[in-house]
Amino acid sequence: VSGRHDFFTGTPLEQTGAMILWECLEREGVEVVFGYPGGAILPAYHAMENSSVRHVLARHEQGAAHMADGYARASGRVGVVLATSGPGATNLVTGLATAMMDSVPLVAITGQVTSSLLGSDAFQEVDVTGVTLPITKHNYLVQRPEQIAPAIREAFALARSGRPGPVLVDITKDAQIASTVLDWEGAFPTRHLRHLPAEVPKAELDKALDMIRASHRPLILAGHGVTLSGASAALLAFAEQAKIPVAATLLGLGAFPAGHPLFLGFMGMHGSPWTNLAIQEADLILAFGMRFDDRVTGDPATFAPHATKIHVEIDRAEVGKIINVDLALQGDLRNVLERMQPDLAPVPSETWLAHLEEMKADHGPKEAESWPPMPTTNGLGPIEVLRTLFQEAPDAVWVTDVGQHQMWQAQVMRHSRPRTLITSGGLGTMGFALPAAIGAKMACPEAEVWVVAGDGGIQMNSQEFMTLVQEGLKINVAVINNGTLGMVRQWQTLFYDDRRSASGLANPDFVLLAEAYGMKGMRAGTLADSLSAVQAARACPEPVLIEFVVDPEACVYPIIPSGARLQDMMHEPNLPIPASR
């Protein structure tokens, strides 16, 4: 996009709304967008050829939204997705809801029918601002070209500020076509940003420090907010200085080094037993950047019953929503931790730390790399597969789908850096992994990127294999094929009288499917085959799909039944592990 001023006179030149849109994206530092063209967004696509922004053509708008999501999670920058009106816009809904639940900064730009046709049920007209209002931080309907730049600038500011999230800008076709002279040097208001929380008062920080000094069994719960605020280094320094152990939510994995002596492990419904029991025995809970999701707390009335609770959270709406806390610090987590650290004294927690080590010994192997222990399986065990994958590629970016494999990887893979685990947490969106991995690879082209998906989830957006191949991306895909919707089947087995209604899958030949898309396909049914396949995939310059044929009866343990207490864990029946303390 160029030519905004006359070469001789310097007077501003007219630009179409579509030209303004691309210049806005360039000014925001956007390097890549993901999208799918259609009638109402065609003026924008027509102007795209003059832009430096790269466009990745998805095969479905949901895939494009997940690509933008994966890009944002891997890079920390705002992901951008484009779609046309009507079905193009509605196909974004699942992707926007996924980003909203997990606080991922996205800007979705949709075309809309001409202004004069709004409200007339015109071809491909949908009130997309109305549809997406509950699943975006904010959205805009733009009907004039001069409104585009302020809306886009504000959308980016909103998406990345405070608690991040998706913002949608719906632009009518005539606004894209019409021309205007824009004062680019003028100020564009960002009115919503004045509502951001102020810095936490020092008096409140002093209260928190006093509560920490008074504790004997403190525990830090690290959530996604640690990564979002760039607070991983600050958390490490805080925990080491105070000698406080750390547990992580699913989206908090990687925010604190998994190999660190103070790291307890994954918490919640499928978390390690000692981590959940530690929560129930702690006398102080420091909840950092987490929202007390039901998969983490179990029965809220019995969560951490002996603990004083401090909640550091940027979103005031999350404070007291599920768990009542004794002290809420609303603000940026990194800022809070860095300001508290100079006055932070070590907690006398040697007895507490020794007790936690005893609990680990009571509930499984002392070596964290050997937990969870292998259950009895018929054939290749999925835990063996995931352990092999991580042992061969410990520094990779892992993008997982949703289901049993997602929980096994959280138990097995020892993530030690932020943004190396990308997964759908809050919404639990099957079909997320493959397109999200494409976005992650676009954000981090030098990184090794792996998809881990079940045979059910991989088929929900398998059309994006073609996007992967067309873009020339080296991504490896591990399909954990148990011939069933594994988590559904597990719940049917445990809680619904083993009545397996509609959970069995008839699958395609995944090796042939990969080859049809231009990838290399492999199949593994033994541990030896698995190891050789993973090594071959890593050595291959082309994208590779490996189908791991695993035991269809394997279950994820431990599991806390929905609504039960954290200590009410169900364990693998054949393992001699105590259920509670």
Where do the PLM segments sit?
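Thiamine diphosphate
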Residues: L42-S115, L117-L118, F123-Q124, W274-D293, G320-I322, M407-L485, ...
